[in-house]
Swiss-Prot record:
It holds the Pfam family NIR_SIR_ferr. Its EC number is 1.8.1.2. Pathway: Sulfur metabolism; hydrogen sulfide biosynthesis; hydrogen sulfide from sulfite (NADPH route): step 1/1. The gene is cysI. This is Sulfite reductase [NADPH] hemoprotein beta-component. It comes from the Bacteria. Siroheme binds at C492.
Length: 588
């Protein structure tokens, strides 16, 4: 580590550490006093540090905000429950596992639903505290867990859900699993709390033998997201992750290495110009056999240099700002013991899922079902949850959750194809969906998310209905615009990589961002601030009308609004996300 690198990367050490750092240091390797709270029947939630500690075990405490005020008027505690997010690198799950997951959701979940996430896994909303150990023990029995799917760890690792290139996808999937396992915490805290139910005291001698060689005793400074992706399909929204491995093939189609890109992230804070979303930047190329070494050294560099004083500036993109990309690369190379090679050529052309049937190179069929906002539940006329259960009872392949919140019924034999399609159609898993809707996304937001400022999942269907009408009005109904709504600027709906991105500001009001692109390589800029959905639709009516008439051949909406001068592109978000007048001058 050079003196210049140290100086550029560690200025935050002059400030006091955030309280989360104390919490982690005193947690007995993430055990806390969670078991004591589980025995407390006076509250449906967790107290003190445990409110944060359960996040390391893949859970968040929430409540039903629709009835919060009503319960307060009645002098009742908010209806508290937990969100649990499963660890499922690459998103592959077996039908037998799904059957048990479905049963738990029906029997123990306030909302009787399963939510597919754009982190390529499933989560439960509305699990009462009294059912948490039962839930974790079920996952354990199924060979699953929820370790490190939240808080200051490497989250669920994404992987391209490419059902056509089966052999290459399998290789990429195996690497996603290896990366996930390699970067997991080594503590037995999760098993002690949730499976064994064993209380551990800080004085217990064996704690002195526990070690976290990669993550460290206080783990990472902030959340950390990783993806493995196979061009040309950017279905994992690679540019929004902290660490990305872009698969490179040789002439024979064999996976030979990865381009590594780092520092993507989509969260920011309204009005706080020290925060910004940004796309991942190119670090270099590595041969495939060096993948785990590179992943570890990138993570440990972030562990040691990431800001532990200000959590709003703790993600890897801010570390790059402090160290510079070259300084960060230098430190990673020092730890690896070898240098990155030059980036290999690659290109992304799209990122949506191939809805419907596709045939793989192994002659197996794969059915991708569109699930709006990833919500699998039974509604009148659309019993998706029962449909998935019926498919799980007969399907002999596997299910693949996609990073677009959809699900693939994968590895269907020719002779089983019609039966699978009949079930999917009967229960509404196949239907006539517009291209616009296929390329839409939302976060959960109300009523369960404590950070929600505006509706998202519940607003999306009607908003897309109205936008579909506008598309039809201008004779572009067969085309699409990547459209996303997120209920706050935390970024879960990935609106900061959309062509049209809505970011919740207050109840019924949003900031409208425009200018992302179809492959997902550009941050959209704010076009209008704090406006209502009807006002947004009126703005988009005029803009889509212009796009329909003035666009070049195959020009996406996001590219058009920039070329037409309607909005300026975000060139370097560190500098110009908040002020287009600061766009760096690009020289040829």
């Amino acid at each position: 580590m050079t003196d210049s690198t140290k100086q550029k990367g560690l200025e935050w050490q002059k400030q006091g550490l955030s309280d989360n750092e104390r919490l982690k240091a005193e947690s007995n390797f993430l055990r806390g006093t969670i078991l004591d709270d589980l025995e407390d029947g006076l509250t449906g939630g967790f107290k003190g540090d445990n409110f944060q500690m359960i996040r390391f075990h893949g859970m968040y405490e929430q409540d039903d905000r629709d009835i919060r005020a009503e319960r307060a008027d009645e002098k009742l505690e908010a209806r508290k429950f937990m969100l649990l997010r499963c660890r499922l690198p690459g998103g592959i799950i077996k039908p037998a596992q799904w059957i048990e997951i479905d049963k738990f959701a029906r029997d123990n979940n306030y909302y009787q639903s399963i939510r597919l996430t754009n982190r390529q896994t499933f989560q439960y909303h509305g699990v009462p505290k009294t059912k948490l150990q039962e839930m974790h023990r079920l996952l354990h029995k199924l060979g699953l867990d929820s370790i490190a799917t939240a808080s200051d760890m490497n989250r669920n690792v994404l992987c391209s859900s490419n059902p056509v290139e089966s052999e290459l996808h399998q290789e990429a999937y195996e690497w996603a699993k290896k990366i996930s396992e390699h970067l997991l915490p080594r503590t037995n805290g999760y098993l002690d709390v949730w499976i064994a139910g064993k209380k551990v005291q800080s004085s217990d001698s064996f704690l002195g033998q526990e070690d976290e060689p990669i993550l460290g005793k206080t783990y990472l400074p902030r959340k950390y997201k990783t993806a493995v992706v196979l061009p040309p399909l950017n279905d994992v929204d690679m540019y929004g992750n902290d660490m990305n491995f872009v698969g490179i093939q040789d002439e024979a189609g064999k996976l030979v290495g990865f381009n590594v890109l780092v520092g993507g992230g989509l969260s920011f804070e309204h009005g706080n110009t020290k925060t910004y979303p940004n796309v991942a930047l190119e670090l270099g190329y590595i041969p495939v056999e060096q993948t785990l070494k590179a992943a570890e050294c990138i993570v440990t560099t972030q562990r040691d240099f990431g800001n532990r004083a200000d959590r709003k500036n703790a993600r890897l993109r801010y570390t790059l700002q402090n160290m510079t990309l070259d300084g960060f690369r230098e430190e990673v190379e020092r730890r690896m013991g070898f240098k990155f090679e030059s980036i290999r050529p690659f290109e992304f052309t799209e990122r949506g899922d191939r809805i419907g049937w596709v045939k793989g190179i192994d002659d197996k069929w794969h059915l991708t079902c569109f699930i709006e906002s990833g919500r699998i539940t039974d509604k009148p006329g659309k019993p998706l949850m029962t449909g998935m259960l019926e498919l799980a009872k007969v399907h002999t392949g596997d299910f693949r959750i996609t990073a677009n919140q959809n699900i693939i019924i994968a590895n269907v034999a020719e002779e089983d194809k019609q039966r699978i399609e009949d079930i999917a159609r009967e229960y509404g898993l196949i239907g006539n969906i517009s291209k616009l809707r296929e390329n839409s996304m939302s976060c959960v937001s109300f009523p369960t998310c404590p950070l929600a400022m505006a509706e998202s999942e519940r607003a999306l269907p009607e908003f897309i209905d109205e936008l579909d009408n506008i598309m039809a009005k201008h004779d572009v109904a067969d085309d699409y615009i990547v459209t996303r709504i997120t209920g706050c600027p935390n970024g879960c709906g990935r609106a900061m990589l959309a062509e049209i991105g809505l970011v919740g500001k207050a109840i019924g009001r949003y900031n409208l961002h425009l200018g992302g692109d179809r492959p997902g390589t550009r941050i959209p800029r704010m076009y209008k601030e704090n406006i209502t959905l009807p006002e947004i639709l009126a703005e988009l009516d005029g803009l889509i009308g212009r796009w329909a008439k003035e666009r070049n051949s195959n020009e996406g909406f996001g590219d058009f609004v920039i070329r037409a001068g309607i909005i300026k592109p975000v060139v370097n978000a560190v500098v110009d996300f908040w002020d287009a007048n600061l766009i760096p001058t690009v020289t040829a």
